[in-house]
Amino acid sequence: MTRGFLWAALLAAATVSAAAGDFDAALAKRLGADQYGMKPYVLVILKTGPKTDLPKDVQTKIFQGHMANIKRLAVGGKLIVAGPFFENAQHYEGIFIFNVAKVEEAEPLLRTDPAVAAGALAFEAYGWYGSAALQETVAIHNRIAKASP
């Protein structure tokens, strides 16, 4: 049993050592990662807003602006994840993850969204601690998406 424990300990030590050898200090610094490879963001849950009776042509125009705003914020490095929810009982419409540290920094960005400004969408915003690598999502997505909505 002692021999098995020693082999397991050596294997674990080798695994940890290999993982530590993969650390890229320059990348961690560029992404603003802490010692765990993490950083603060703001997670936003978009919900159905109070204006549910907008005419179809107005809704279409608002959501075209919503998509254009998403693209603008992503290109500017402020929005790193965005996407819709499937239909659900909570009336959650989608999520944003903003590359800002505080809710107070995200709120002005949210107010630039035509769907939020028109009341078609409402939001809840929360401080969130996640992998600094999420900032690479937009660049990777642009390489794998054939079309844009």
Predicted regions and their residues:
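Conserved, structured core segments of small domains
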Residues: 19-149
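N-terminal signal peptide c-region/cleavage motif recognized by signal peptidases
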Residues: 13-17
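Bacterial N-terminal signal peptides that target proteins for export
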Residues: 1-8
